[in-house]
């Protein structure tokens, strides 16, 4: 609106419209009109009596076109970049060629733009970074090889990756250049001059001298391919499990390596704001933007799974070679029985580790199969360049337990050459392309609000001053410089939040359009149900067949660290940790185990919330304990500072706010004032009138609904309009409160109907989930069994 109001101040937005109405096939645009007819059209320079205009979003930014016949053949008016990244890309060195280096070595004829840029970069000590934005399949790997072949003074190189598959692929391409893969090495890696290493293992390149000072190499060159994926990896839960370093400290160690290195090379198909911030942190840079479009793909979205599978299987029956890109590994498990007797390969996190080794020569390996399927375990690092696959099919999934829309396009891009450029995609969620999505400013505002609520710092370099008056302590922010880590984390949170079901297609559509591809919809009002396949064995049934007691878990953990696990051994570990998380003692009763797994496998987060909120876990996580910590506004360092610096981790901050919202809900419903609750504190029956009063009180007075826009992301809720507080919207408020409490293992539900004063009305119950409590009590030694699953839980 800022762009268009510059030319038409009285503009009104009318939504997104399909372009075929105006003979603009496969184009979607933003439609506008304006009321002041004296405003001059910026395209023709004349005033129109009635026509409106539209704006198209492209990979180059926003362009305005007018509906008037006088403007029909005139050039579109460029309005500006679609976001801050567009300006960053627009200011780069622009090229448009199939390969970054078309012919010859760096110093060889013919003269080429990228060759000159590389020579300038490596000969100028003042230019730290070369950043290359170029589509997949345009020779980024070849360009790096030519750099290493030409410059023999680049001896010490650190190549940072974020996926084991990427590390394998890089090693396969560069082992002849003297690189070693961290996955093949034991112990400390300080002595290796050319090293490929995953972010998670960066601590292995540091050593300590006799005085316990940290020592690491000064590298001639640090390379980060797939820079956007690397930045997003700092959201990984596996990094948070590191007992030696916090995620923030791991990030700082990476910065130290890069800051002291002589040169930095970063590459990706789509450099975003995370990349820009990262690049700018190290001083002067040269950015190259390759505008070449290898294959223009058409993503066709259907919500009919039955039809999707019929078309897929028909293509396979006709002998076509197909690739199935799935955001859900479990969907591939369901598909696998349909491939019986065919040549196929499936890559998921549960696949045999030997398959990872095959990816070093993927162009040879995948050609053996008619069908290739993979989950987000292959997001990057695999470049299949052969003419082999006729079609790609995509299974899309939203939510926090899968990859982002950006990662999906990375997955699709693994296949460089494709017989049919139309990609059929199944998606069961909403298909609106104009949803209100989360932005950087949204997430920044939320974290600022969480700091205020918790009284603890979340974003680094935010300085507070402590004021004490009338026995109350007030923390006021006096400066607000955000560290690079926090900037990038906020962008990561934006990407994560926009995986919400209502925003998923909107974000995917924008990314597809910006990449020069298109999206079309072929949805039906009532999709056919897929008939259950009796040949499919559920994942729970597969786990039940495994006797984990026959394996030594410590040996499997050692094999896991060396990437030597078989598929069966991975399932053993999965079952072992599932049982450990829930406190299951005995899985010999297979039927009971299957029932338990199907019921609770997807509720680990609910159990985590339940244990923390009701005080089963470390008491330092409770709300009461948080109140008494003063170290966060002083110069003191807390004890055990190796993993917990003076800042709250971002997730800890969100958990603390969630807990306070739950306490606030319960206090308002029960009309009490408590700082926290134990599992014995809930067990109430409310009359109809008490229930009605409670829900309206929560709607009117709770901290959640007072700042709903700030708190919705905490509970995976989408942005949108707020509901007025009235009887008409009563069900909405009750449904929201019920769902939020349920995410903590607290039940608030309608019970039996009773006659009260000659009228029939319902009772309402507020209590902890008995089954969840029984399981948690057993795990913490507070009970001897779980009534519903006595064979799994016994002493």
Curated annotation (Swiss-Prot):
ATP binds at residues 134-141. Keywords: ATP-binding, Helicase, Hydrolase, Nucleotide-binding. One of its GO terms (molecular function) is ATP binding. Residues 121-289 form the Helicase ATP-binding domain. Its EC number is 3.6.4.-. The keyword Nucleotide-binding applies. It is an enzyme of class 3 (hydrolase). InterPro entries: P-loop_NTPase (IPR027417), Replication_origin-bd (IPR003450). Probably involved in DNA replication. May bind the genome origin of replication (ori). Belongs to the mimivirus R1 family. This is Putative replication origin-binding protein.
């Amino acid at each position: 609106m800022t762009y268009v109001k510059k030319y038409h101040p009285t503009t009104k937005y009318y939504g997104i419209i399909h372009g075929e109405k105006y003979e603009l096939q496969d184009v979607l645009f933003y439609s506008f009109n304006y009321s002041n007819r004296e405003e001059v059209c910026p395209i023709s320079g004349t005033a129109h009596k009635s026509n409106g205009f539209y704006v198209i979003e492209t990979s180059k930014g926003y362009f305005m076109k007018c509906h008037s016949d006088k403007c029909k053949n005139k050039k579109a008016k460029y309005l500006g970049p679609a976001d801050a990244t567009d300006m960053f890309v627009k200011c780069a060195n622009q090229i448009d060629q199939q390969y970054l280096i078309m012919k010859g070595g760096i110093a060889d004829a013919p003269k080429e733009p990228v060759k000159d840029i590389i020579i300038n970069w490596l000969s100028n000590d003042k230019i730290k970074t070369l950043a290359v934005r170029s589509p997949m399949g345009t020779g980024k790997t070849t360009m790096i090889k030519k750099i290493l072949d030409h410059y023999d003074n680049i001896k010490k190189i650190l190549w940072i990756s974020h996926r084991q598959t990427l590390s394998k692929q890089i090693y396969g391409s560069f082992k002849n250049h003297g690189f070693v893969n961290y996955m093949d090495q034991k112990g400390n890696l300080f002595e290796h001059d050319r090293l490929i290493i995953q972010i998670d293992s960066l601590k292995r390149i540091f050593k300590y001298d006799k005085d316990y000072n940290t020592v690491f190499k000064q590298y001639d060159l640090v390379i980060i391919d797939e820079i956007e994926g690397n930045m997003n990896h700092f959201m990984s839960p596996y990094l948070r499990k590191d007992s030696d370093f916090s995620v923030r400290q791991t990030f700082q160690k990476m910065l130290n390596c890069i800051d002291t290195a002589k040169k930095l090379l970063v590459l990706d198909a789509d450099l975003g704001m995370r990349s820009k911030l990262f690049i700018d942190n190290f001083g002067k840079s040269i950015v190259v933007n390759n505008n070449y479009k290898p294959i223009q793909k058409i993503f066709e979205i259907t919500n009919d799974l039955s039809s999707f599978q019929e078309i897929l299987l028909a293509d396979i029956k006709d002998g076509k070679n197909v690739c199935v890109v799935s955001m859900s590994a479990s969907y591939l498990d369901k598909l696998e029985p349909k491939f019986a007797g065919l040549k196929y390969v499936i890559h998921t996190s549960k696949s045999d580790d030997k398959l990872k080794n095959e990816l070093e020569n993927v162009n040879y390996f995948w050609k053996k199969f008619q069908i290739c399927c993979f989950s987000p375990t292959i997001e990057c690092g695999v470049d299949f360049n052969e003419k082999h696959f006729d079609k790609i099919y995509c299974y899309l999934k939203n939510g926090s337990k899968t990859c982002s829309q950006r990662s999906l396009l990375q997955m699709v891009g693994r296949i460089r050459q494709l017989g049919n450029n139309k990609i059929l995609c199944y998606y069961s969620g909403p298909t609106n392309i104009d949803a209100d999505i989360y932005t950087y400013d949204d997430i920044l505002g939320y974290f600022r609000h969480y700091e205020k609520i918790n009284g603890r710092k979340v974003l680094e370099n935010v300085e507070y001053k402590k004021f004490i008056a009338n026995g109350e302590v007030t923390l006021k922010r006096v400066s607000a410089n955000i560290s690079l880590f926090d900037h990038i984390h906020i962008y990561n949170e934006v990407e994560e939040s926009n995986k919400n079901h209502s925003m998923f297609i909107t974000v995917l559509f924008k990314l597809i359009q910006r990449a020069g591809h298109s999206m079309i919809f072929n949805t039906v009002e009532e999709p056919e149900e897929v008939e259950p396949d009796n040949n499919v064995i559920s994942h729970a049934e597969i786990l039940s067949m495994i006797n984990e007691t026959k394996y030594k878990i410590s040996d499997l953990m050692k094999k896991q660290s060396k990437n030597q696990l078989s598929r069966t051994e991975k399932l053993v570990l999965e079952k072992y940790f599932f049982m450990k998380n829930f406190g299951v003692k005995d899985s010999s009763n297979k039927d009971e185990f299957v029932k338990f797994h199907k019921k609770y496998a997807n509720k680990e987060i609910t159990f985590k919330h339940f244990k923390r909120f009701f005080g089963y876990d470390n008491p330092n996580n409770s709300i009461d304990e948080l109140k008494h910590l003063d170290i966060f506004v002083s110069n003191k360092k807390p004890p055990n500072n190796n993993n917990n610096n003076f800042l709250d981790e971002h997730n800890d901050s969100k958990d603390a706010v969630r807990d306070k919202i739950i306490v606030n809900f319960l206090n308002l419903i029960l009309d009490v004032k408590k700082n926290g609750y134990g599992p014995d504190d809930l067990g109430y029956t409310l009359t109809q009138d008490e229930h009605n009063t409670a829900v309206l009180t929560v709607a009117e007075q709770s901290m959640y609904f007072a700042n709903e826009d700030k708190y919705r992301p905490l509970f995976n809720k989408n942005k949108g309009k707020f509901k007025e507080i009235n009887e008409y919207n009563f069900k909405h408020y009750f449904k929201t409160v019920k769902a939020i409490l349920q995410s903590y293992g607290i039940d608030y539900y309608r019970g039996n109907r009773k006659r009260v004063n000659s009228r029939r009305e319902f009772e309402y119950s507020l209590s902890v989930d008995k089954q969840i409590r029984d399981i948690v009590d057993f795990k913490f030694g507070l009970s001897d069994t779980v009534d519903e699953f006595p064979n799994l839980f016994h002493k």
